[in-house]
UniProtKB/Swiss-Prot annotation:
One of its GO terms (biological process) is error-free translesion synthesis. SUPFAM superfamilies: ApaG-like (SSF110069). The gene is apaG. The lineage of its organism: Bacteria, Pseudomonadati, Pseudomonadota, Gammaproteobacteria, Alteromonadales. It holds the Pfam family DUF525. It comes from Shewanella sediminis (strain HAW-EB3). This is Protein ApaG.
Amino acid sequence: MTSLEDSIKVEVKTEYIEGQSSPTEERYLFRYTITIVNLGEKAVTLKSRYWSITDANNHNSEVRGEGVVGETPTIEPDSAYQYTSGTVLETPLGVMQGSYTMITGEGESFKAQIPPFRLAVPGMLH
């Protein structure tokens, strides 16, 4: 690995939650499952998160906070951490992206990028 940033791989799976959504009220609920894989040689702790969420109307919201789902997990080398969370959009289509602030046991801080991923009601895109 060339850098600490390259040592973290973020994988995302999304799901539209139809039963808790209400299109007539412009409420579309999506669940996302994130897997954070530590490909590096050092254990890292996830300290905080940053999300940029954009819907189909180009409305952008930003979310910052400590940890994820109430935890600040430490991810050992060649290990992964997975969690599930959700978000509500006013449109049936949107994009999320962001970063995690990570720290090594030696106190080195870095940002692990979360690549853009699509939130879409099934059938919205061909």
